Structures are given as structure tokens and as C-alpha cells.
Amino acid sequence: MLDAAVERKYSASPGETFYTGGGAQTFTNFESDDNSRILTVHRAFQHSVNLVFVRLMRDIVHYEMVQTTGPSSEWLGDTATRKMYLTRFADQESRVYMKRFYTKYHGKTPDQQITLLLLGVRKSPPKVATALRSVAPDQSNAWFNKMMYAALKNTPSASMLDDEDLANLYDKYGINRFNLNDRGYISSVHPLELWTLNYLRKHPDATLAQIETASQDVRLSTYSWLFKTRYHATQDRRIKRMVELRAFDAIGKSWQALGYPFASLTPSYAAAIGASGDRPAALAQLIGVIANGGNKVPTETLTQIDFAKDTPYETHFRRAVVAPQQQVSPEIASEVRMLLRDVVTGGTARRLAQGMTFPNGETLEVYGKTGTGDQRLNVYAKGARLIESRKVNRSATFVFALGDRFYGTLTAWVHEPYAARYDFTSALAVQLLKSMAPALQPLLDKPVQKTVTAVPAESTPAATKVAAH
């Protein structure tokens, strides 16, 4: 079954746009020659073909959606379940907005806050008036008039408005005349931005947590439109987003068990091709699990510490033996090891296809996986026209195992402004490891240390042995 799984075929075409709750994404392959091919997972793993793994990740996410939540008929067809997910979505997304607006206005003076708000308001008397009356409802007519003239300066409206017009605007767009959603519509400002600024002007020392608590009902009311039946298709997309997040959460937890170092996984298919941001130590731990037949063996720096030797206070601390934890079944570990070996024998790490030969003539089999990183900052104009592309980072990584004893990660990394000067692939990391054979020779000369279960020794006045975790 595992052999059949890695021979499953996927298109490597970059012509598809992939949609998740986070938005639309497109991907490219490192080698354009792969674009028209249909490849097995095995072959794509050998040659690092991105689009195959993007589509594989999509299948995994869809599988986890069913595993965590059930078939779509269960969470789209039940009214109570739909309401639960929509409420959860509204709460989650509104918190994102609240954090954004809190960061924007917190710590600024009242005048600075108003100036910052009006920068994003179109210079129309109704819009400016609604924004001002929403965030500062208790201010006087005189203050309102002053702010209106300042905001509309150098516009035709400024010369046309007299005191009577301003008084009418003051009354017409008062905070009690329209609900929050309507005021957001009139002013073209997000309703939660109006509410947040109004709250901060009254409670300048409020924390984000306090604002989130105080705004609980308000945040849900701003999404009242979402619960209307005429937005059924929109509701379905939001519900799918929440179910999808549960799937990514489940995937993230399974990755954490194998050493993934972060608390959550970015909900994107790009996680399958490196966007998840693994650290070198985490990659080394993962291949260590594969090298140990699926077992996670604890990392040890010190195994024993001796204090006050040959004195009455002599004490020995010995690390307690921890049994290996089975993280991956031996069958899966064996299959992955085969794939990793094929990367070296016929894929992107071919420079070590004959193994790694050391100065003493000994040759160790090598298996591993390469990865090339080309992180760019792209700036787009209207119409998705690319106007700037700047290299931010360039990296080449090889996570490897040598024989049955050694494994690790080797990464070459260049940060801007120097990244633009370099153009290399993961072959650099492979060649670098190959050239390090003389430096690694002393490791081979050390005898293999057998792990022996410690047996507590009898305590004597001159020697106390303590097991330490």
C-alpha cells in the first residue's frame, strides 16, 4: 500500500490557482521543464517538483477536514452547526480587525488619532461628519466645525459650507441617528474602527484584551449581515474556512510530534514546499526519527556529572534512561528512507550518489533531502502588474543521514542586501557536506557508545548516585 501511495500521480502544471481560506495562491516549479509533466510522488520527491506537493497537500487537507469535522453534508446541511461556525468565524475575524485598529490608534494623542482617521476618509461632508460624530460624539459644535473645516480644506465643499450647514450635519449624523454598521457604510470606514477609536478616546489606557471583552457584542453585530439567508454562498465559504483551519490545526499537531518547532501551522498549501519555516534543528530531528526506524530518541548533551570526587560529599548525577518513543511506524520510516536514498542516487543530491568517502578510505551511504529557498519581496501595482522584485533571502539546505550513526542539517544562507549577489541551489549544500569529509573523520574514529540501563547504586557516606531527568 505504501509503495502504491508514493507512485500516485499528480500534475506538475503551475497553471492552476489554489484557494484556501487565506486567499488565492499560485505556485511555480524550480525547473520549467517540469511544468507539462504528470509525475508520481516518488519522482517529484527526487527532483523537488513543487506543484506535485501543493496538490498532495490539498488532498491531505481535504482528508483532514473529513476526519476532524465529518463530510460537508454534516456541517453545511445543519442549521445549528452553520450558526455555530459562522459565529466562530465572526468572532475570530473581528479579533483580527480589533488588533489592527488597536495597534493603529493606541498610544497616540486624541488629535493624532483624529488626524490618522481622517487620512483614510474621502473628503465628502457626509463621510467626514459621520466619522467625526462616531468617534467623538460628545464634542461640541465648535469643535466639530473646526475639524470639518480642517478636513475639507482646499476642497470645493469647504467654501460652500456655512454654520447652518455644519449644524445640520452635526445633528443629522449623530451617533444615535444610525447604527454602527450604517455609520461605517456612510463614512466608508470599517465599523469596528469607528468603535475602537471611540472606546480608546474614553479609555486611553485600555489593553487589547479589555477592548476585545468590551466589544464582544459589537463585534458580532457588525457581522449580522453574514447570518442573513440571502448570503448562503458566502456563508458556505466562511464555514469551509473554519473547517479548513481545524484541518490545518490537526496537521500542525502531527508535525509537532515529529519536531516541528512552532505552535501553529500557516493555513496554506505552501506549507508543503517550505513556507512552514522549519528550523535546521527540527529538520535534523525529523531525519533522526527516520534514521531510527520511526523512533524519537532523546537528545543528550550530558549523560553524567560528577561532583566533589574523592571527598565525603562525592555525588554523581546520571541521566535517567528514557525509552525511545515511536513517532512513525517502521513501515513508513522504511518507505521514507527509500525515497531519501533515491534523492541521492538519482535526484537533486546526486553528488553523493556513491556515498561519502573519508580520508581513511571508509565510505558511508548517504540519504537525505535537498531544498532551495529564494524568498523575494514582490511589489505590485494596479492590475497585478509587478513593479519591483527584491531578493530577501537565498538559502540551500541538505538534511541528511550518514550510515547508521550520523545525521544532521547543513544550510547555506544569505540575507539581503547580499542575497541579490548570489545565485545557487541546494547542490551547494550537498557539495559542501562532501568536502567536509576530512573534518568529520574524527567522528568515525570514536567508538559507538552503547546505551546501558542505569541500575541505582547503593548509597555510601562517600558516594551518592542520583538519577536525573
Task: Please name every model-derived segment.
Residues M1-N35, W75-F101:
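Extended charged low-complexity segments that act as oligomerization/scaffolding linkers
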Residues L2, H42-R43, V54, T103-R237, ...:
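A penicillin-recognizing enzyme superfamily signal
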Residues G22-T68, S72, T348-R350, T372:
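Polyanion-binding and phosphate-handling cores
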Residues L51, R55-M57, Q67-Q112, Y231-I239:
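N-terminal leader/propeptide and maturation segments of large enzyme subunits in energy/redox metabolism
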Residues Q67-G70, D78-T79, E244-P261:
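Short, charged, amphipathic alpha-helices and their helix-cap/turn boundaries
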Residues A257-A271:
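Extracellular-facing binding/remodeling surfaces
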